């Protein structure tokens, strides 16, 4: 008895590149991207553009080599921030890893005053969404719409990564169970070897409903308020302004960059800032666009001459690819079913920590500069990611033009503790890569002296960037910088909620796709209850 209009800026999700798992790398790095916003950050004060001389490093000799700073030293490198621009949003272009975060994260949200958002409160919504092919127990459900599956590619290098890692840390077969800590293989949001985005899981089954209207290729300019109540959205369809009225409420689901900037264009935010952009302030809410948090990540790549590894400029992979394509078409298994980052770990850089503070991703290809740097040959890479950064940034509109990219400033590494933890995390990662059987692969593209903290810091400043998990810019809470309450309604306004990763008050310890889906499931129940549906 309720009609719903879904408005998406991007096109339909009907590309084979979306649904074939391993092809997401081509979507992210397309020179003329159709399915992502190719955002960049503003220049980051703690980033540099230092490059190192590529060479062979012997892992047995502390990663070998010395980090060399060239004479042409450029500071303030920009980061890359691609976001999904199609039905399903970033769940249609991500690496599909199913990670919820740590129990501590949600209990921390509740401790900040967000009643109803503790781990025990949100676990039922993780389970409600989940259709897990491997597990059904206190932590998992096997009948939800979001299919969760094992990776359908048995890569020997991932097995070697786990063998090396478990000589130092415990093994786990479930990062989302009783204890997150350990090393193992990721699960993915796939079904029968195909990407299982939120569009596949939720939207496609609902398309036949007569009360659902889906608009694609439609840009939302702003929300229209009457007496501080959301009454309509102003859209641009093929450049022509249209106004879509709503009888009940507007739900903003634009993510950590889309939702706060839409609020700002609508006149909701810091008054002085809005007036500087010639926007009338409808409602002053200083937290809009503040509290940006993101996982910073460092990657090391190793060239290995192997048929089992991927490479964009690799003769072996070029020769193998046609057979892998046929294998995927016939069986939905093999390299093209892979999320590329197949193995991983959640580890502590200090034994006294309550929860892991770093995450590793072991990838079956050399993923340099988000895959934008084409590296000849085959190889593997390993990421180390800082799970709970102390650095906090902002996102703001550049102008009131909805087609202008936002000004994204994560302020990566601005808090000294983040660099300290990243250095420790780098050493943890290299300890694993320096252990049999991985230590036989010693051709490191950018060798760093593992015993020189300053060299490691320089490498991190030169090569680290996001791993695509921005959150917090419309944070939930009851303090003066909170944007939404625990029902996800915008403070001081009526008829408008935010339902996406931007409402997270703090960053969770893991990938953010599954937590965002949990938020949406919980929001659906809140909306049903408050509207007596």
Sequence positions of predicted segments:
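N-terminal redox-cofactor-binding region of secreted/periplasmic oxidoreductases
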Residues: 1-533
């Amino acid at each position: 008895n309720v009609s719903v209009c879904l408005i998406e800026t991007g096109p339909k999700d009907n590309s084979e590149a979306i649904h074939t798992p391993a092809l997401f790398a081509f979507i992210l790095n397309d020179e003329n991207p159709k399915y992502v916003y190719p955002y960049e950050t503003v220049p980051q004060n703690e980033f540099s553009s230092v490059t190192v001389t590529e060479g062979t490093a012997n892992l047995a000799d502390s990663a070998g080599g010395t980090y060399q700073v060239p004479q042409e030293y450029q500071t303030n490198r920009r980061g890359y921030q691609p976001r999904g621009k199609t039905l399903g949003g970033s769940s249609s272009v991500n690496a599909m890893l199913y990670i919820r975060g740590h129990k501590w994260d949600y209990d921390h949200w509740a401790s900040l005053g967000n009643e109803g958002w503790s781990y025990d409160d949100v676990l039922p919504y993780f389970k409600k969404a989940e259709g897990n092919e491997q597990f059904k127990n206190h932590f998992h459900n096997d009948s939800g719409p979001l299919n969760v599956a094992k990776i359908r590619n048995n890569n020997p290098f991932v097995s070697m990564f786990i063998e090396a890692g478990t000589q130092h840390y415990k093994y786990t077969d479930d990062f989302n169970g009783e204890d997150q800590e350990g090393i193992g293989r990721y699960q993915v949001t796939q079904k029968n070897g195909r990407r299982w985005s939120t569009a596949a899981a939720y939207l496609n089954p609902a398309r036949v409903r007569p009360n659902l209207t889906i608009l694609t290729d439609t840009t939302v300019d702003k929300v229209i308020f009457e007496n501080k109540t959301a009454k309509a959205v102003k859209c641009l369809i093929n450049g022509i302004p249209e106004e879509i009225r709503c009888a009940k409420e507007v739900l903003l689901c634009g993510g950590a960059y889309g939702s706060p900037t839409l609020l700002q264009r609508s006149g909701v935010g810091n008054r002085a800032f809005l007036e500087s952009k010639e926007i009338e302030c409808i409602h002053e809410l200083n937290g809009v666009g503040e509290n940006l948090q993101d996982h910073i990540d460092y990657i090391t790549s190793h060239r290995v001459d192997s048929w089992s590894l991927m490479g964009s400029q690799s003769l072996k992979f070029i020769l193998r690819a046609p057979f892998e394509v046929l294998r995927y078409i016939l069986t939905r298994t093999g390299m093209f079913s892979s999320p590329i980052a197949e193995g991983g770990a959640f580890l502590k850089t200090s034994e006294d920590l309550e929860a892991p503070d770093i995450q590793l991703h072991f990838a079956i290809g050399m993923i340099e500069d988000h895959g934008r740097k084409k590296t000849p040959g085959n190889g593997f890479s390993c990421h180390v990611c800082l799970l709970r950064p102390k650095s906090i940034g902002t996102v703001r509109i550049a102008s009131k033009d909805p087609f202008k990219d936002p000004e994204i400033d994560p302020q990566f590494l601005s808090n000294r503790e983040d660099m300290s933890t990243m250095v420790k995390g780098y050493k943890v990662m290299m300890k694993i890569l320096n252990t049999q059987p991985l230590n036989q692969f010693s051709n490191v593209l950018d060798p760093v002296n593992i015993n020189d903290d300053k060299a490691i810091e320089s490498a991190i400043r030169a090569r680290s960037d996001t791993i695509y998990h921005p959150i917090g810019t419309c944070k939930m809470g009851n303090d003066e910088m909170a944007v939404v309450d625990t029902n996800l309604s915008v403070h001081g306004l009526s008829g408008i909620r935010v339902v996406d990763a931007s409402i997270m008050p703090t960053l969770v310890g893991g990938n953010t796709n599954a937590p965002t889906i949990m938020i949406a499931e919980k929001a659906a129940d809140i909306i049903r209850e408050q509207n007596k549906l």
